[in-house]
Amino acid sequence: MSEPNAIVKVGNIIFSNEAPFSLIAGPCQIESRDHAFEMAGRIKTITDQVGIGFVYKSSYDKANRTSLSAVRGVGLENAMAIFSDLKKEFGCPILTDVHTEEQCTVVASTVDILQIPAFLCRQTDLLVAAAKTGRVINIKKGQFLAPWDMKNVLRKVTQSGNRNVMLCERGTSFGYNRLISDMRSLPILRSFGAPVIFDATHSVQEPGGQGDSSGGQRQFVEILARAAVSVGVAGIFLETHQDPDNAPSDGPNMIKIDHLQRLLETLMEFDYLSKKTIE
């Protein structure tokens, strides 16, 4: 098979399992233009201060909400305009999800990293369509998959002509409404040659845990993130918000943006020790 690139570059941001980790962060969904600008600006200021690469993430459509009445987002067209303006204002690359083959070309015209949601990670047509855009692809490992199953998922993208792929661990189903993080997954994913991302906030999600919405245990985000960077990863994925308890989606597992800088500074220390050992 075509081997994935061990180093993936997105603008001036580098994702490599042997380099200092970069951050993918933002609110779960685009709530409004003003909110997106507020969050991107605050995160960019923090990452500039601590000296870490930053990719802004947010979703335009939360297509797998627990309830039909749940807020899904601003939609594709509105999101592309917002993302374009965010890139001009802050100079940061953008990541967002795609759910259908038809969305891939539209999203790729503006967005730098196309993310394949965990529930869709085995959908061959979606993977091939995303790969053919030539954009960087971040594939979330399904909660239902063993880490070694992701090798076949990775092949679908690389054999479609795109070697710029990253694999993202976001927890494994463990009984009803629960996820666990098996840190052995990270070196297994790393052995396939692609940069590995750890999603520290969705890993503490409780899918459907509140009946008509998902719950979460944000008190464990820092613990799991520390463990992941200690093992060695290319990037950390975090959802953050100024008021998570009142966010329209995934509030229980998002961290308060007021806590982000201290968390990153802590993770950078663990990351340094981990990468020093790898060398």
UniProtKB/Swiss-Prot annotation:
The keyword Cytoplasm applies. It is an enzyme of class 2 (transferase). It is found in: Cytoplasm. Its EC number is 2.5.1.55. GO terms for biological process: keto-3-deoxy-D-manno-octulosonic acid biosynthetic process. GO terms for cellular component: cytoplasm. Pathway: Carbohydrate biosynthesis; 3-deoxy-D-manno-octulosonate biosynthesis; 3-deoxy-D-manno-octulosonate from D-ribulose 5-phosphate: step 2/3; Bacterial outer membrane biogenesis; lipopolysaccharide biosynthesis. Keywords: Cytoplasm, Lipopolysaccharide biosynthesis, Transferase. GO terms for molecular function: 3-deoxy-8-phosphooctulonate synthase activity. It catalyses: D-arabinose 5-phosphate + phosphoenolpyruvate + H2O = 3-deoxy-alpha-D-manno-2-octulosonate-8-phosphate + phosphate. The keyword DNA-binding does not apply. Belongs to the KdsA family. This is 2-dehydro-3-deoxyphosphooctonate aldolase. It comes from Bartonella henselae (strain ATCC 49882 / DSM 28221 / CCUG 30454 / Houston 1).
